[in-house]
Swiss-Prot record:
Organism expressing this protein natively: Paraburkholderia phytofirmans (strain DSM 17436 / LMG 22146 / PsJN) (Burkholderia phytofirmans)
Protein name: L-threonine 3-dehydrogenase
Cofactor: Zn(2+)
Assembly information from the UniProt record: Homotetramer.
Pathway in which this enzyme or protein is active: Amino-acid degradation; L-threonine degradation via oxydo-reductase pathway; glycine from L-threonine: step 1/2
Active site residues of this protein: 40, 43
Record's catalysed reaction(s): L-threonine + NAD(+) = (2S)-2-amino-3-oxobutanoate + NADH + H(+)
Listed GO MF terms: L-threonine 3-dehydrogenase activity; zinc ion binding
Species lineage: Bacteria, Pseudomonadati, Pseudomonadota, Betaproteobacteria, Burkholderiales
Gene Ontology biological-process entries: L-threonine catabolic process to glycine
Note describing how the cofactor binds: Binds 2 Zn(2+) ions per subunit.
Family annotation (PROSITE patterns): ADH_ZINC (PS00059)
Pfam family for this entry, one: ADH_N
Length: 343
């Protein structure tokens, strides 16, 4: 089958032929129709330090996808041939304390699809049936293909009550932009997002941001004054991993504020801990999606009017993958979709 693979320890990916995967007793085989390019895939493409330490070579990658079940293991229940599915990219052990307590998103033995094992940038993907998630007919393939990052945004944004709250989002990547739409959808008052990328800040405006702030030109404090915010933000969603962004968030938070951290800062990042302690801030780390509460929340929000269509900015056939990755690397895109139906 055709697949996008890392064949050598160097930048880039190669469209190549690989062996079709085999289906185990508890697995489903999915014929892939759409995939999306993730920031993780960009790290793999660039072959940065993280990728060099993490990604087996050779291996085909990718973990944002939708497709149709074409084969099932003999023990699989609850699915049928022809079901349209996406899937949870974190394969958990099922036996550690957190798994057995129902907190599978906190499994200490997680294996990542397209990171630690063969991925979805291929004509076919095999995953445990437990990880598959049925997609309702009213949700398009393009939207279903981005359920993985949409889930990151949902898990982060819904970590705290947002109704009537003032929310600061630092980092206008696709996940941060989707978090804007989620926060507004569930009833936040002011949703302010910061970045230095004008293209993506404009996308955030289209997704409902109260203010989209280019911090290279505009002061967050001035924006807060314009919005008559006298006490600071109630909730912070840190999506960038940029230390200066986190610092500005800590300074802008109200006492008793709550922060969810999805962005990954450098290992030795220093912050002013007095901001955390004397303000009584609550900080929560976010990894992946809650299984499967986050997935049900995603579907419910889309069915109740959440519009993510502005984030779907570019579409390519898989044969044009190099142009697709170049578009993502340019910084002037939202989500980039690859069509596998012509593969």
């Amino acid at each position: 089958m055709k697949a996008l693979a890392k064949l050598e320890r160097a930048p880039g990916l190669t469209l190549t032929d690989v062996k079709k995967p085999e289906v185990g007793h508890n697995d489903v085989m999915i014929r892939i129709t759409r995939t999306a390019i993730c920031g993780t895939d960009i790290h793999i493409w660039k072959w940065d330090d993280w990728a060099q330490k993490t990604i087996p070579v050779p291996m085909h990658v990718g973990h944002e996808y939708v497709g149709e079940i074409v084969e099932m293991g003999q023990e699989v229940r609850g699915f049928a041939i022809g079901d349209r599915v996406s899937g949870e990219g974190h394969i958990t052990c099922g036996f550690c304390r957190n798994c057995r307590a129902g907190r599978r998103h906190l499994c200490r033995n997680t294996v990542g699809v397209g990171v630690n094992r063969e991925g979805a940038f291929a004509e076919y993907l095999v995953i445990p049936a437990f990880n598959a998630f049925k997609i309702p007919p009213e949700i398009s393939d393009d939207l279903a293909a981005i359920f993985d990052p949409f889930g990151n945004a949902t898990h982060t944004a819904l970590s705290f009550n947002l109704v009537g709250e003032d929310v600061l989002i630092t980092g206008a990547g696709p996940i941060g932009i989707m978090a804007v739409a989620i926060a507004k959808h569930v009833g936040a008052r002011n949703v302010v997002i910061t970045d230095v990328n004008d293209y993506r800040l404009e996308l955030a405006r289209k997704m409902g941001a109260t203010r989209a702030v280019n911090v290279s030109r505009e002061s967050l404090r001035d924006v807060m004054a314009d919005l008559h915010m006298t006490e600071g933000f109630d909730v912070g969603l840190e999506m960038s991993g940029v230390p200066s962004a986190f610092t500005s968030m800590l300074e802008a938070m109200n006492h008793g504020g709550k922060i969810a951290l999805l962005g990954i800062p450098p290992a030795q990042t220093a912050i002013d801990w007095t901001q955390v302690i004397f303000k009584g801030l609550e900080i929560k780390g976010i990894y992946g999606r809650e299984m499967f509460e986050t997935w049900y929340k995603m579907v419910a929000m889309l069915q109740s009017g959440l519009d993510l269509s502005p984030i779907l900015t570019h579409h390519f056939k898989v044969d044009d993958y190099q142009e697709a990755f170049a578009t993502m690397l340019s910084g002037e895109s939202g989500k980039v979709i690859l069509d596998w139906t012509a593969a």
